[in-house]
């Protein structure tokens, strides 16, 4: 199989944003690929825009990075001019405007999440084309196709912070198990009135699904775990 190392860097990706009763939780995997080649196993796909607003990035790594950089700059100017941080809604609509005005060139889907004193915790999904949709939860990236049914069953309104983060970590680990373009570690960002908390979940601490093997220390351990019991002589 030939690898095209000149292919654009793509975050095949699973990104998630969830509201809870005091704020929002954002989550993402960490795999960045170039065609079939894994270019980065531990990339950070949750990018800070302001002190209280973050964005989850999927699609073309270059496109999503440049959009985030422009938005961060404009929001900084907004804060200087108005003397207060931009709201989550303002941040999301600025991304929507950039995505819509450049929709023929950009290949990126984004989830904006944050907390502000006017509306509390908010999640906005901004898919390809520049639509902006406020949602109680949003999922995106190639791994999202495996999660719609899961969220239909597992989502509930007015969750606690702990319940929301557990849901996000479980969902991303499920997508990693099923989606070849998602992988690596799970990162979460919790945003509420008290500030921002970042958490990191390494791959060997994630929940295993169905036929996945428990981690083994050696080839002998793997063979012993997979093989039948030896017959008595």
From Swiss-Prot:
Subunit structure as annotated in this protein's UniProt entry: Component of the 20S core complex of the 26S proteasome. The 26S proteasome is composed of a core protease (CP), known as the 20S proteasome, capped at one or both ends by the 19S regulatory particle (RP/PA700). The 20S proteasome core is composed of 28 subunits that are arranged in four stacked rings, resulting in a barrel-shaped structure. The two end rings are each formed by seven alpha subunits, and the two central rings are each formed by seven beta subunits. The catalytic chamber with the active sites is on the inside of the barrel.
Protein's cellular compartments: Cytoplasm; Nucleus
Free-text function comment from the UniProt entry: The proteasome is a multicatalytic proteinase complex which is characterized by its ability to cleave peptides with Arg, Phe, Tyr, Leu, and Glu adjacent to the leaving group at neutral or slightly basic pH. The proteasome has an ATP-dependent proteolytic activity.
Full protein name: Proteasome subunit beta type-6
EC number annotated for this UniProt entry: 3.4.25.1
Originating species: Arabidopsis thaliana (Mouse-ear cress)
GO cellular component, one term: nucleus
Active-site residues per Swiss-Prot or TrEMBL entry: 13 (nucleophile)
GO biological process: proteolysis involved in protein catabolic process
Catalytic activities: Cleavage of peptide bonds with very broad specificity
Keyword Nucleus on entry: yes
Statement: the UniProt record of this protein carries the keyword Transcription: no
Gene Ontology molecular function: threonine-type endopeptidase activity
UniProt keyword terms in alphabetical order: Cytoplasm, Hydrolase, Nucleus, Protease, Proteasome, Threonine protease, Zymogen
InterPro entries: Ntn_hydrolases_N (IPR029055), Pept_T1A_subB (IPR000243), Proteasome_bsu_CS (IPR016050), Proteasome_sua/b (IPR001353), Proteasome_suB-type (IPR023333)
Chain residues in the propeptide: 1-12
Stated family: Belongs to the peptidase T1B family.
Stored Pfam families: Proteasome
